[in-house]
Amino acid sequence: MRAFLIGRWQPFHKGHLEIIKKISKEVDEIIIGIGSCQKSHTLTDPFTAGERMMMITKTLENYDINYYAIPINDIDYNAVWVSSVESLTPPFTTVYTGNSLVRELFSEKNYAVKKPELYNRTDYSGTKIRKKMLDGSTWEHLVPEEVVKVIEEIDGINRIRRLNEKDYDEE
C-alpha cells in the first residue's frame, strides 16, 4: 500500500520524523508531499522546496523507509487540487493529514483519510522552532542533525533574521 502525507516542513523536525516512522510501519511506501512548494523567503515559509527536499532526504537516508518526496504547488482552486496532486504523484490509496481542508478534499474523492497522531506538539512545532531561530534560542535539539547541517549550509538562521528586519527605520 502507498500513502500520501503532505506538509510544509518549515523546517522538517523530529515530530515530522516520528510521524513518518510510524506511517512507514503501516504502509509499503510514503509519498511525502512538500506542500506550498512555490513559497519561500518569508517568515512563515523561509525555506525553498529544494532546501526542504534536502532536509527530508538527508534525514531519511538513515532509516529503512521507502518514500518519494514530491513538491506540491498551492493552486488556490480547491475543487481541483486533488487532481493536481494526483497528476504529480504515483498512485496512492490512503492520505495522512491533520489539515481539515485536505481531509475534506480527499474524502470527497473517496480516499481513505487518516489523521496522524502528532508527536509532542508542545515542543515540535515549525512555528515555535522558527521563532527560536529568530530570537537566538536553542532550536537544534528539535530537528534531526541533518536538518541542522542543511540550515547551516544555506545560512538559514541569518535569512530568517534578515526577513524579519524592517525595510525602513520608524521615526
UniProtKB/Swiss-Prot annotation:
Coiled coil region boundaries: none
Keywords: ATP-binding, Cytoplasm, NAD, Nucleotide-binding, Nucleotidyltransferase, Pyridine nucleotide biosynthesis, Transferase
Catalytic activity entry: beta-nicotinamide D-ribonucleotide + ATP + H(+) = diphosphate + NAD(+)
Localization per Swiss-Prot or TrEMBL: Cytoplasm
GO biological process, one term: NAD biosynthetic process
InterPro entries: Cyt_trans-like, NMN_Atrans_arc, Rossmann-like_a/b/a_fold
Chief site of localization: cytoplasm
Listed Gene3D superfamilies: HUPs
One Gene Ontology cellular component: cytoplasm
Enzyme class per UniProt: transferase
Tree of life domain: Archaea
Protein family: Belongs to the archaeal NMN adenylyltransferase family.
NCBIfam families: arch_NMN_Atrans, cyt_tran_rel, PRK01153.1
Name of the molecule in the record: Nicotinamide-nucleotide adenylyltransferase
Record organism: Methanococcus maripaludis (strain C5 / ATCC BAA-1333)
